[in-house]
Amino acid sequence: MNIDLSGKTALVTGSTQGIGLAIAEGLARSGARVAVNGRTAARVDEAAERVRGLGGTAFGVADDVSTEEGTAQLLAQLPEVDILVNNLGIFGAVPAREITDAQWRIDVEVNGVAAVRLIRACLPCMADRGWRRAIQIASDSALVIPEEMIHYSVSKTALRAVSRGFAKDAAGTGVTVNSVIAGPTHTAGVEDFVYELVDKSLPWEEAQREFMVKYRPQSLLQRLIEPAEIANMVTYLASPLASATTGGALRVDGGYVDSILP
């Protein structure tokens, strides 16, 4: 299977590390020109250089897309986006009854509204030009709700509705809009999260095993997913090979969601 994204410009939000960086690398390997995004210029430049070091074409856009102002600044630098990947997200473990109104608002704003803002801005030009892609990185927590992350789960559930709704809005234009349901994934942020829940003195491999057994026992992989495994699905969805896939929520969850349905 050959995926060729030559001549396409991709924007991956929150792509200085973890899943976002892996997605940027995957798209660049397939020939896309990738805009690496984050809030800190130094980290953005470092990530873009890493992508270029793999032989890809990448440049940095250091703007905070969780805000209206930051989004406007970014879009001024990127008047045309062929592949939009809304990867930006925050998460944290908080006991259900202790999640404050402010924490609810922040998760919904950063994980949900920020994606809506970018899709809304990019979709008109995408529809005018035909073939384009908008992909949202959702989470297994949208389907299997952890009691310590209800606010996060709500925001990621919203992303599934956002993708389905905008896919309907783009019907017949050649633009596809999908979400990817990412399962428990091995990133620096997730390592920190794991150590919030298990003994901090444990070596990482042991801590990971304890976390999976105690907090994610449904996983059929029985390990954390690697970011590149999420990126493989995103690269496919961004390609012409996925031309008939739209309005969907595709799972890369290691069998974590106990369902035979998508």
Which role fits each region the language model picked out?
Residues 3-6, 144, 234-235, 241, ...:
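Short C-terminal tail/terminal secondary-structure segment
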Residues 124, 168-169:
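Alpha-helical segment proximal to the catalytic Tyr-Lys
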Residues 171, 176, 245-247:
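Short, small/polar-rich loop/turn modules that mediate ligand/substrate recognition or access, typified
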Residues 139:
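Residue(s) in the substrate-gating loop at a strand-loop-helix junction
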Residues 119, 155, 163:
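Active-site helix of classical SDR
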Residues 95-96, 100-105, 215:
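Substrate-binding pocket helix/loop in short-chain dehydrogenase/reductase
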